[in-house]
A protein has these predicted regions:
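Long, non-catalytic architectural segments outside compact domain cores
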Residues: 1-32, 36, 40, 47, ...
Length: 68
């Protein structure tokens, strides 16, 4: 079972590696688990996708620039 910290950590890695394209990557992962019938894993990847989207949104980037 993935913890909330695990999910945020994974989302951060994906956001750093792929930027906004990481949202699509996480969505594809969620879809693959849905097709495979692994509903709990799909839910984890949907959560990761939402967090990658939050981390890569323009508002998030603006806030990061203001904090430096």
């Amino acid at each position: 079972v993935a913890t909330e910290a695990d999910i945020w950590r994974t989302a951060g890695i994906i956001a750093a590696e792929y930027g906004a394209e990481g949202v699509s990557f996480a969505g594809q992962m969620a879809l693959s688990f849905e097709i495979g019938g692994k509903v709990e894993d799909q839910k984890v990847w949907l959560s990761i996708m939402e967090k990658v989207e939050a981390l890569t949104s323009p508002a998030s980037e603006d806030a990061a620039q203001l904090s430096h």
